[in-house]
Amino acid sequence: MLDMILAGLSEALQLANLLFVLLGVIAGMIAGAIPGVNGPMAIALCIPLSYYMSPVAAIGFLVGLNKGAFFGGSISGVLLNTPGTPESAATTWDGYPLAKQGKGEKALRMALYASVTGDAFATLVLILVAAPLAAVAL
């Protein structure tokens, strides 16, 4: 299993693929900051763009788009008290009062840290649990 993970990492960490992931994260942050546009909707809108990419770059772009939308929703949640995505509804409770006190940058930074930490933890759990869970399911 470790050899497959390392082979996947070597393919995913190529410069072109990382640039598509970065592009997806930026586009996802913009889409998530627009109230009413969430990650799956942004993915549905950008799937036609993925036809012109390599498969690894396209998957990286779409995953980056979804993960960027998670944080992007907290931008409008903190600054406008209107969450951009359902995942960022909790940022309105603490983030908007901080923004009213003039600490909007701190609230956005904390939302970014929480988004990255939670997403990294969820990804690690998925990597570790997916194979044993699939064996039980089949």
Predicted features by range, described:
Residues 29, 45-48, 62-70, 111-116:
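Transmembrane helix-bundle signature of multi-pass membrane transporters/permeases
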Residues 1-58, 135-137:
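Helix-loop-helix hairpins and the membrane-proximal interhelical loops
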Residues 60, 64-93:
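Juxtamembrane transmembrane-helix boundary signature
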Residues 14, 23, 63, 108-113:
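Internal alpha-helical transmembrane segments of multi-pass membrane proteins, especially GPCRs
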Residues 56-60, 97-114:
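Membrane-interface alpha-helices at helix entry/exit sites of multi-pass transporters
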Residues 107-138:
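Membrane-embedded alpha-helical modules
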Residues 31-41, 78-88, 121-125:
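Short helix-coil transition sites and intra-membrane helix breaks within transmembrane domains
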